[in-house]
Amino acid sequence: MQNPSTVTQESAAPVFDFFPRLRGLTSRNRSPCSNSDGYALSSSNALYFNGFRTLPSRRMGKTLASLSFNTKSSAGSSLRRFISDFNSFIRFHCDKVVPESFASVGGVGLSSDENGIRENGTGGVLGEEGLPLNGVEADRPKKVLILMSDTGGGHRASAEAIRAAFNQEFGDEYQVFITDLWTDHTPWPFNQLPRSYNFLVKHGTLWKMTYYGTSPRIVHQSNFAATSTFIAREIAQGLMKYQPDIIISVHPLMQHVPLRVLRSKGLLKKIVFTTVITDLSTCHPTWFHKLVTRCYCPSTEVAKRAQKAGLETSQIKVYGLPVRPSFVKPVRPKVELRRELGMDENLPAVLLMGGGEGMGPIEATARALADALYDKNLGEAVGQVLIICGRNKKLQSKLSSLDWKIPVQVKGFITKMEECMGACDCIITKAGPGTIAEAMIRGLPIILNGYIAGQEAGNVPYVVENGCGKFSKSPKEISKIVADWFGPASKELEIMSQNALRLAKPEAVFKIVHDMHELVRKKNSLPQLSCTA
């Protein structure tokens, strides 16, 4: 294969071709061609639309697709021609935008100044900052890159839990980085993902249209392919900035584009790519990608969805949802925790949460609880409330200023949630998967007071049908349930607590990181999955 022409950064259409270095890393045949500018191209140096790729064959000059159209109509032919043309555009564009940092250890060497690739004297390849790419030096700390986005608090919480588990289990053997790939490494409007999510969630109809409208494979695959044409270079730079040995996605939008980039440069054998799903039951189809090394599912329900999406059994592990390692530590006595939090040491307590942003009917529920947990005949409280307002300082200030008839503690953003849960007897929260998993580990019966359509909808029957809690959107009904649990229905509270403990998986995060450690250790012998995106 002839080396591509040297192109300076000032060129209007820079092209970076590393196939001399990538020879031997992939089993697919490559055939160079030329575009109208005279640059050397390669059929595999592209991000493919819905799994399409052009095969250089004298007999077959047509574009083949993993997705077949079972129609001979003119409409079907037109659609196939459109997709073929669009795929050619993606291939032409992406050959010019994937950055120099994507260099892999290969069988054919280049001079030290070709395409910005430098060697370290031992046959390894150095990246932009002179650091060896993954797999080059066995003595260096292995690097883990966790991809997340602040669309809700659960993704960051899972990322932090995984990082803490790596640090606790392996110490300096791993360096763990967390990045919001879209916000930190892509241009406008792609870097507005968290803001867009928050807007859509606040407008339920728009969110439902977005969630269910993008569920079909042909829709979201087409969307990712089109998006790749604009941000492939930025995504590649964002990934290789860290020179990762492991890439972990804890967000449904953090695998398709990165995997396309890695595949286009032949790095799927070099980097272990895993997905840690953070939805307990229902989850968006974008969570699943056939090219991942491993897909960690929190429940058998999610594992079944993964298999239906085409993942092999060997790719799927069901360990549970990763929660902070601090939740695995022995529970301190309730009296001690309540004393530290300024709570009454003897009264039963309910934990009222609204997520990291303090959303939901917290004030209305708190007022209803204050009435229900006050015995007018005795003139005293029969329960107490611990309210977590998250980052909602306005709500925290308002609730703190009220005169309550029962003991009420109002807190802002909390980092030691395990202590707050350990001090209480039950919890009221929206159906966020992370909070549910943490509550189960602490054996707290759960009252769900809301959910986000789509990904959180399945969490409600998951809790209710497993006998771990109840669901109601009515503050008055919720307060009655709590009052009954603290009184005549105390036996039900105890049974639900036992059910929650039975369903809990506190060791999930440790099982996940140890499995990843084994994947890295064996990565040179792992077979590469041969399938389309």
From Swiss-Prot:
What CDD domains does this protein map onto?
Answer: GT28_Beta-DGS-like (cd17507)
Give any single GO term for biological process.
Answer: thylakoid membrane organization
Q: What is the effect of changing R260A?
A: Slight increase of enzyme activation by phosphatidylglycerol (PG)
Keyword hit for Acyltransferase: no
Q: Which terms are listed as keywords in the entry? A: Chloroplast, Glycosyltransferase, Membrane, Plastid, Plastid inner membrane, Transferase, Transit peptide
GO annotation, cellular component aspect: chloroplast envelope; chloroplast inner membrane; plasma membrane; plastid
Annotated effect of mutating E456N: Reduces enzyme activation by phosphatidate (PA) and phosphatidylglycerol (PG) 15-fold
Enzyme class of the recorded protein, top EC level: transferase
Q: Which domain of life is it from?
A: Eukaryota
Impact upon substituting D279N: Reduces catalytic activity 50-fold
Pfam families from the entry? Answer: Glyco_tran_28_C, MGDG_synth
Catalysed transformations (reactions): a 1,2-diacyl-sn-glycerol + UDP-alpha-D-galactose = a 1,2-diacyl-3-O-(beta-D-galactosyl)-sn-glycerol + UDP + H(+); 1,2-di-(9Z,12Z-octadecadienoyl)-sn-glycerol + UDP-alpha-D-galactose = 1,2-di-(9Z,12Z-octadecadienoyl)-3-beta-D-galactosyl-sn-glycerol + UDP + H(+); 1-(9Z-octadecenoyl)-2-hexadecanoyl-sn-glycerol + UDP-alpha-D-galactose = 1-(9Z-octadecenoyl)-2-hexadecanoyl-3-beta-D-galactosyl-sn-glycerol + UDP + H(+); 1,2-di-(9Z-octadecenoyl)-sn-glycerol + UDP-alpha-D-galactose = 1,2-di-(9Z-octadecenoyl)-3-beta-D-galactosyl-sn-glycerol + UDP + H(+)
Activity regulation: the record says:
Activated by phosphatidate (PA) and phosphatidylglycerol (PG). Inhibited by galvestine-1.
What is the residue range of the signal peptide feature? Answer: none
Query: Changing H251A: reported impact?
Result: Reduces enzyme activation by phosphatidate (PA) and phosphatidylglycerol (PG) 4-fold
Its biological purpose is as follows: Involved in the synthesis of the major structural component of photosynthetic membranes. Required for proper thylakoid membrane biogenesis. Does not discriminate between prokaryotic (18:1/16:0) or eukaryotic (18:2/18:2) 1,2-diacylglycerol species, but operates with some preference for the prokaryotic one. Is responsible for most galactolipid synthesis in chloroplasts. Required for the formation of thylakoid membranes and functional photosynthetic electron transport during cotyledons greening in young seedlings.
Spell out the family assignment given in the record's similarity comment: Belongs to the glycosyltransferase 28 family.
> What is this protein's record name?
Monogalactosyldiacylglycerol synthase 1, chloroplastic
Record organism: Arabidopsis thaliana (Mouse-ear cress)
Primary gene name: MGD1
